[in-house]
């Protein structure tokens, strides 16, 4: 069985990880956006032979600890979802992919 570790990057209270007030008056937290995507992925894959391992719990867990949790769960793939800054004045942006393992 294929095991997919899902992580809704960052915790709910991680400082600064929210939408710019100029485009979202509610300043939606990045965790909320990431969690919705992880929930949808888990829902879509729910009826398959893919086992979902959730690494997120709303707390700000260090990235090394998240990776260790995925490894402990013997995940075949670890997917960490993020919404990077960069819209209308933000400095960040982009998509990253990192590979590793054997």
Set out the residue ranges of the language-model regions.
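Glycine-rich, N-terminal phosphate-binding loop of Rossmann-like dinucleotide-binding domains
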Residues: 82
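Active-site histidine-acidic residue metal-binding/catalytic motifs
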Residues: 1-68, 73
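A short, glycine/acidic-enriched catalytic loop
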Residues: 13-29, 85-102
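Short acidic/polar active-site loop segments enriched in Thr and Asp
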Residues: 76
